[in-house]
Swiss-Prot record:
Segment forming the signal sequence: none
SUPFAM superfamilies attached to this UniProt entry: Ribonuclease H-like
GO MF entries: nuclease activity
PANTHER family, alphabetized: POLYNUCLEOTIDYL TRANSFERASE, RIBONUCLEASE H-LIKE SUPERFAMILY PROTEIN (PTHR33317:SF4)
SMART domains, per database record: YqgFc
GO CC term, one of those recorded: cytoplasm
UniProt cross-references to InterPro entries, sorted A to Z: RNaseH-like_sf, YqgF, YqgF/RNaseH-like_dom, YqgF/RNaseH-like_dom_sf
Enzyme class (EC, first level): hydrolase
UniProt name for this protein: Putative pre-16S rRNA nuclease
Record has Nucleotide-binding as a keyword: no
Keyword annotations of the record: Cytoplasm, Hydrolase, Nuclease, Ribosome biogenesis
A Pfam family matched in the record: RuvX
Length: 218
């Protein structure tokens, strides 16, 4: 692929990526995608290095019901690595109708172009990739019951309990929890807990406590 055409953009090229384990759809340009194609995933890093983009936009794959999937975390892992060198974003694919329609067609190059387009047309569905983790000094005794970690920023927290649920809408934080073996949801379940540890929305969480349950707010 000859990318000399884009050398004069002064670092303002934007790249959109529809990530897959074997191949990726990529689209690049300034305000509009001027080229879209499919490349082997193994070549993605070198492709982006040569293009020297100002921003990278990854489509965030969620299930149609809005749940995290294994493909979500594979994509987030790659996006997080790129975020250490480039300004990187994740855009929820479901919230763009045209992107949703491509699921049946599965044209990776077109998908990347639509992800590119969604960044400009509906930036509210896109989130800049940063490291959301924060070390929290919290000593907990073993809990003989069910625990909820809600938007809690420390995936390394050592907690012993019969069951631990994690809920966060931050896909990067969810990825780090999944690496530690947790099942992570984006929405609260209709259940009650013996202990809730929360990073936000504490008042709203009281209804999810069991009788004599405890709520810990940061």
């Amino acid at each position: 692929m000859d990318i000399q055409l884009f050398q004069g953009y002064g670092g303002k090229v934007i790249v959109a990526v529809d990530y897959g384990e074997r191949k990726c759809g990529v689209a690049f340009g300034e305000i509009l995608p001027q080229k879209s194609l499919v490349i082997p995933t193994k070549n993605l890093k070198e492709f982006i290095r040569k293009l020297k983009p100002d921003k990278i936009i990854f489509g965030l794959p969620l299930s149609m019901s809005g749940k995290y999937t294994q493909q979500t975390f594979k994509t987030v892992a790659v996006a997080f690595k790129f975020s250490k060198e480039y300004e990187t974003y994740l855009c929820d694919e479901r919230l763009t109708t045209k992107i949703g329609e491509r699921i049946s067609k599965r044209d990776d190059a077109v998908s990347a172009a639509l992800i590119f387009q969604s960044f400009f047309e509906n930036s509210s569905v896109c989130e800049k990739v940063t490291d959301p983790r924060k070390k929290v000094d919290l000593a907990l005794e073993k809990v003989d019951g069910e625990v909820l970690l809600y938007e809690f920023p420390d995936p390394s927290l050592n907690i012993e309990a019969r069951e631990v649920d994690v809920v966060t809408k931050n896909p990067v934080l969810a990825y780090f929890y999944s690496k530690n073996g947790y099942f992570v949801g984006r929405e609260l379940w209709e259940k009650k807990y013996d202990l809730i540890i929360s990073g936000k929305n504490c008042e709203e969480l009281k209804k999810y406590l069991k009788e004599n349950g405890r709520l810990v707010c940061l």
